[in-house]
Regions:
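Short gly/ser-rich anion-binding loops that grip negatively charged ligand groups
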Residues: 59-66, 87-94, 119-123
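N-terminal glycine-rich anion-binding loop in soluble enzyme alpha/beta folds
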Residues: 5-68
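Short beta-strand/turn micro-motifs composed of small residues
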Residues: 8, 89, 237
Length: 285
């Protein structure tokens, strides 16, 4: 096994069990519900919806702090002063986490043993980069930290992600679209496809109709647009996704020739933005 330890935020939506298996250390991001701020992953993502139902407000999210990184890094280097750490960051344009890590390692004796890579992805998009890098390290245990960082950049560039919210209520409540836009969108049953482009969440084509009906069209179009490889595809979902969507996407993936399908549930951070019932796609070119 490679001696390189991977670091990522909980916003990557990698489970604790998978992180342990892949030699990945998770740094908490944060979710604020009213006057209370909690670590992402310390409570069920379903609670995000419960809070919105009670208050009409979406919880706010925040990145990992320098202290969060210092806590994890101090533990790593106290156990092994010669450790090497590759931090595969949540999109740096969407959160402070990347800069927090920079601050955390400033003037530390282990600063030269830590490399930072902005994956320019969020949620399972970031998670897919972390997983692929971890598997590459298992196949290349002799790789240097610089080689691993370069490979992670390559993997991140090849990773494509999009998701579709069930409705616009959470985007409206979070200030990401106006009341009028949300009202019209919900009345017309419109669902914007949010694609992660250069680290930013960009609204693209609007699909109309039931989520289970548009799922197959989105998969076909997203696959063709990017020429996704057929060896593996991830489907992601927030809490309370309709089971019919899973059935449709599994069948369409099989019809399109995808060899392996992995479903991953999002945590609290992306659920705050996408709301319940959302689903998405992560693939590689």
């Amino acid at each position: 096994m490679s001696s390189i330890i991977l670091l990522a935020e909980t916003g990557s939506d990698i489970t604790k069990e998978l992180a342990q298996d892949l030699n990945v250390r998770l740094v908490p991001m944060h979710v604020t519900l009213g006057d209370v701020t909690l670590d992402d992953g310390s409570f069920p993502a379903e609670d995000v919806h419960s809070y919105y139902e009670r208050t009409g407000k979406t919880p706010t999210t925040s990145g990992s702090t320098p202290y969060d990184f210092e806590s994890v890094l101090e533990e790593i280097f106290s156990q092994d002063p010669n450790a090497q750490v590759l931090y595969l960051a949540y999109s740096a344009v969407t959160t402070c986490s990347y800069h927090s890590c920079e601050l955390a390692i400033e003037e530390k004796p282990y600063a030269n043993q830590v490399r930072l890579v902005d994956t320019k992805h969020v949620s399972v998009g970031q998670g897919a980069v972390v997983i692929a890098t971890a598997k590459w390290l298992r196949e290349h245990p002799e790789a240097t930290l610089e080689e691993a960082a370069a490979k992670a950049v390559e993997i991140a560039d090849q990773t494509k992600m999009c998701f579709i919210p069930k409705n616009l209520d959470y985007l409206r409540a979070g200030g990401r679209c106006s009341n009028a836009v949300a009202l019209v969108g919900n009345l017309l049953n419109l669902h914007p496809c949010i694609e992660i482009i250069d680290g930013r969440l960009i609204a693209g084509k609007k699909y109309r109709g039931a989520m289970s009906k548009l799922a197959s069209a989105l998969l076909r179009e997203f696959s063709e647009k990017h020429g996704l490889k057929k060896d593996h595809i991830y489907f992601i979902h927030t809490p309370y996704m309709e089971e019919a969507i899973r059935t449709v996407l599994d069948a369409e993936a099989k019809a399109l020739g995808y060899k392996t399908v992995t479903w991953m549930k999002t945590g609290c951070v992306i659920t705050c933005h996408g709301g319940p019932g959302a689903f998405g796609i992560v693939g590689s070119v």
